[in-house]
Design a protein with these regions (language model features):
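Conserved SAM/SAH cofactor-binding pocket of Class I
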Residues: 1-55
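Short beta->alpha hinge that forms the Motif I/post-I loop of the SAM-binding pocket
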Residues: 26-30, 70, 97
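A short acidic, Gly/Pro-enriched loop at the edge of an enzyme's catalytic core
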Residues: 55-65
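A short SAM/SAH-binding and catalytic strip from SAM-dependent methyltransferases
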Residues: 65-76
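A short glycine-rich, Lys/Arg-flanked "PGG" loop and its adjoining helix->strand segment in the class I
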Residues: 76-91
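Core SAM-dependent methyltransferase catalytic element
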Residues: 115-133
Length: 133
């Protein structure tokens, strides 16, 4: 799943690297349309993109991998929705926030039952990797 897909680059990359299917969403109509255009340009047929926020995850089947490149405040608000569509062994990669946000995001994720695996930092930007046990 590509949450807040923007141009769709993360989801498209996953399909090109062998993902059987990708489901993506964004709150912005332009982003959804742009993702669809980029899917066409890249010959991607096994990806679905819809307009909406994390509330549209309610009732969805679990995903093996969740990717979310979104700012800290939205990530904090959406983490419970993300966890609700993770099964044991699902992984989640979060990005789009600053290094100083790491402790707050790790604390929130752990409080929701996720295991912190790793993080990377580059020029004050950070990425976090979690797994649901």
């Amino acid at each position: 799943m590509d949450a807040g897909c923007g141009t769709g680059v993360l989801g498209i990359f996953c399909t090109l690297k062998g993902a059987k299917s990708v489901w993506a969403y964004d709150i912005d109509r332009w982003s959804v349309d742009n993702t669809k255009e980029n899917m066409l340009l890249n010959g991607v047929k096994n990806m679905e993109v819809v307009e909406g926020n994390a509330s549209i995850l309610q009732g969805k089947d679990a995903f093996d991998l969740i990717l979310a490149n979104i700012n800290r405040n939205i990530l904090l608000a959406d983490l419970p929705s993300f966890v609700s569509v993770m099964h044991a062994g699902s992984q989640m990669i979060l990005s789009g926030f600053y290094v100083e946000d790491i402790p707050l995001l790790v604390q929130k994720a752990k409080s929701l039952g996720l295991s912190y695996l790793n993080h990377t930092e580059k020029e004050n930007w950070a990425t976090l990797l979690f797994e649901r046990l």
